[in-house]
Amino acid sequence: MKIKKFINKVAGATMCAMIIGTTVVSVNVKANAETSMKTTEALDTHVDDGVAGILEKDDFDTQDEYQKYLEKHPQIQSQEVNMASRVSANKNPKPKATLRYKIKGLPRTAAIQKTYIGSTYIYVIQRSGLDSYLSRCVINGSNAVYKDEMKLQNFGHGQTLEWFEYNGIAYFWVTCKANETYKEKWGTQIGRLKYQAGQTIDYTQIPRFSHLSYANKSGSSIGSVKRVDAALSSNGKKILFWVMDNTGEIQYSFYNTSKLNAELDKVQSQSSKYVPCTTSEVKAACTASFRQSGSNRVLPNNSFQGVELSDADSIYIIGGKAQDKPQIAKLTGSGSNYKYEALATPVHDNFGNSAESEGIQLKGDYVYFGINDTSK
């Protein structure tokens, strides 16, 4: 990816921002199986993890690849039709998006999967095979110029990069532990990472949460984990775990971040730095959870490219592959009761057939999102 853009613009009751190519774009939308695990396993994985499941649109690099797969597997095509999201939003705004930042000087052209916009720096994460690269870019007006990076080994593919401070130290929540069963190498765990310029670190070297199939109030498994992501509320008090299993079912779980950080502190200095979501302490930190399956899943453009959580517990989901117009869904509610409040379709001249949505961030009154221009 050579251009990433962020767009930032108020448009009535809806606002947008975005990232395109090696540019960053952002948008802000304001619209009014089931088996309990008895013991902790010796490894940081569930026995079913890595079991291949259905392939969906996000498992392919291009729409053409996905279409060819469906043509070769007609039985899969009918299954995917049944699973396609059919839930309807209460509102369908079309906010105008505005270019906000352009990322310059990145040493590699891989797509930026997620950005974090701070006051001085923009951090961007790119995947290369099983590994990821986390780069720090200095903000200078409407540009952000590459400064340094760290290599994240075996972290896999994720859209999680949530900055926070804990005990006076700056960290990121990130997706980690690549799922090698899938071409996209989806991440299957959520970890706490300290940025260290010039360093190479393996996912086993950071404290993290494993067994995310059990990340819920009941302590029951959703099944074999395919991919996970997370979203931190703006005030840092709550974190949302988003988990998809290999059948496509999705689990949303809300946690008290102070309690989760306390659990990670316990393993920080140990050789095995994972905390299973099956422990009583992690279960107690879960405040609510719910699931979506089949055509009831909220997947804009039948795609998931990132999630965010507001202080008011609203959930924002961005979706769209190349050839899709970016869409942002907003779910409102609390606990396990949510409604599909809005589906926004941001408007911008650069949203052509080669634009792919990448990541989302809430910042002030705006929602920032990335657009990867695959033609660059």
Residue ranges and their predicted role:
Residues 21-40:
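Sec-dependent signal peptide cleavage junction
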Residues 69, 74-105, 113-154, 320-342:
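Beta-propeller domains
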Residues 85-105, 143-155, 198-225, 264-300, ...:
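Surface-exposed loop and turn segments in beta-propeller and other repeat-based domains
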Residues 104-119, 157-175, 219-240, 299-312, ...:
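Structural signature of eukaryotic scaffold interfaces centered on beta-propeller domains
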Residues 128-131, 168, 177-183, 245-249, ...:
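Short glycine/acidic-enriched loop and turn motifs that connect beta-strands
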Residues 132-142, 185-201, 249-274, 325-337, ...:
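Beta-propeller blade signature
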Residues 139-179, 348:
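Blade-loop segments of beta-propeller domains
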Residues 286-337:
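Loop/turn-rich, solvent-exposed surfaces of beta-rich toroidal or solenoidal domains
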